[in-house]
Amino acid sequence: MKRSALLIAAVPVVATAVYLSVPGGSDGAAVGGGPAVSASPHAGELAKERAESESAEDDRLVASRPPGLAAPAKKELAQQILASAENSTLRWRETYGVIEDAGDGDGYTAGIVGFCTGTHDLLALVEGYTEDHPGNGLAGYLPALREVDGTDSHEGLDPGFTDAWRAEAEVPAFRAAQEAERDRVYFEPAVRMAKLDGLGTLGQFVYYDAMVAHGPDTSPAGFYGIREQAVRKAGTPGGGGGEEAYLEAFLEVRRAAVLARDAGADTSRIDTAQRRFLREGNLELSAPLTWQVYGETFRIP
């Protein structure tokens, strides 16, 4: 997860007229009997709570949707597209042991979704893994990981942490822990929120990729802050809006958030990947797929 979700803006998103999809049957019925659209001054926080918690009504709504990105073949496709942006490969299972400092202020970035020492998710991963597997090869670095959390510092991590990470990445239990943390923090909340918003498979991937890159945060540059701004521009399909118009608005807000942090940033994972799929009308994210990220072309037949 990149620091944009945590540090671009420390203030919460607050607006006088923002919108959040709520289950059908509430005041203000939506088009076609789906979720309605409701005004809220804290839509980002409410959306985050809704995506990360369980309610019987939301569970029924999500269960009524097609599997979408949660279908095994589509989930595999999602990991491949994500890996093309995170690690310039489609072979995402070869990236458990990847670790580097990209010089972006996030400290070390590692593993299958780019867990970062500076953005808390790598610390949370190692803490959870150590609870289940005490004495693992990364456990001794927990004090240092806690100290550097929120910074780009390597203090207490060098020189051995990168080698320890690569070694632990050969352990099946740590690979499973990375996948479980990916699903818990990023994949499952993103897909759930997308289904509550009435989005199809492409929209679910758009949410997932943004959740990984921007973090599950409600600041203007975090996932829920980006979603909130997009909903103000174009209502969600679940609230009666058009799916393509909403996704275009979401991607535009996300692109602006990236450029607000770094005006020279490469936005190709948005422009020549997700936007390409959208403008081709591929709302179900069906193969064959061709896209470009960071100047490299990828294809899935």
Regions from the PLM with identified roles:
Residues 2-169, 177-197, 202-301:
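Cell-wall polysaccharide-cleaving catalytic domain and substrate-binding groove, primarily
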Residues 174:
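Donor-sugar nucleotide-binding helix/loop cap in glycosyltransferases
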